[in-house]
């Protein structure tokens, strides 16, 4: 009997990956923003049409850093229909999650129900795109601007998705991407942040490296979330094939529908 897998990691050929990692033995640069890391970051910026991007070692730490870099306080309105990582990241930052119901058709947060939950303690909305379904980004943008709230997206499910000709990750203040092994694009484990404000780059660069600034100072405590060169090399290989992976998944969806 042939097994039909629910998920299966996409991988390049053994030969392609070996060829990609061979230069690591020449540079002996295994982590700390090495050549592969820089190459993948630039390639993803171009592919996703991103203004600014920061790579990290996994999607959860990306979300944790997104919340931290925005200096949030108090409450964050989010969805209960998400992976536990979303809520964990809120709590780990000393923030209180406030749950808003979802749209039963798209499974994304119901933008029409958010305003009733906003209080003087609310500092942000953390919305999650689900199963490739995009949140009501236009309503969410208006709400965030009206109440002066930060708008963060968990975009783990929407790699490469566009809305009205724009990358979904271009909406909001910052979007988190997951490059976990089960995602349509993976770096084995990995994640990234896409954002508009250029000044966040140096801040995130420090936050993903124990809080160490480019000058070598440590103005605040933080974590280690650096992507290593072997992860980046897998990403470089998989990015060459991601369009075909997306097409394969679209064909599966069409068959079920």
Protein language model regions, located:
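N-terminal "arm"/small-domain region of PLP-dependent enzymes with the aminotransferase-like
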Residues: 1-30
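Active-site region of PLP-dependent enzymes
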Residues: 25, 158-164, 171-257
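Phosphate-binding glycine-rich loop
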Residues: 29, 33-75, 81, 89-92, ...
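Short loop/turn motifs at secondary-structure junctions
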Residues: 49, 72, 121, 170-171, ...
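PLP-dependent aminotransferase-like
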Residues: 68-155, 162
């Amino acid at each position: 009997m042939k097994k039909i897998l629910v998920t299966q990691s996409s991988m390049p050929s053994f030969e392609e990956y070996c060829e990609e990692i061979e230069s690591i033995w020449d540079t002996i640069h295994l982590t700390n923003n090495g050549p592969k890391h820089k190459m993948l970051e630039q390639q993803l910026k171009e592919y996703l049409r991103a203004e600014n991007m920061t790579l990290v070692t996994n999607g959860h730490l990306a979300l944790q850093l997104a919340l931290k870099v925005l200096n949030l306080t108090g409450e964050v309105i989010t969805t209960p229909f998400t992976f536990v990582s979303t809520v964990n990241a809120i709590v780990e930052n000393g923030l209180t999650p406030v749950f808003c119901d979802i749209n039963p058709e798209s499974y994304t947060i119901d933008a029409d129900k958010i305003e009733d939950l906003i209080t003087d303690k609310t500092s942000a909305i953390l919305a999650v795109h689900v199963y490739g379904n995009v949140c009501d980004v236009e309503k969410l943008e208006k709400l965030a601007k009206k109440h002066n709230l930060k708008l963060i997206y968990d975009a783990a499910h929407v790699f490469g998705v566009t809305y009205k000709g724009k990358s979904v990750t271009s909406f909001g203040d910052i979007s988190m991407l997951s490059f976990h092994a089960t995602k349509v694009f993976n770096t084995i484990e990995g994640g990234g942040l896409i954002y508009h404000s250029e000044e966040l780059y140096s801040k995130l660069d420090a936050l993903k490296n124990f809080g160490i600034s480019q000058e070598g100072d440590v103005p605040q405590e933080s974590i280690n979330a650096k992507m290593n060169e072997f992860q980046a090399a897998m990403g470089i290989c998989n990015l060459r094939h991601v369009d075909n992976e997306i097409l394969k998944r679209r064909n599966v969806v069409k068959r079920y529908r």
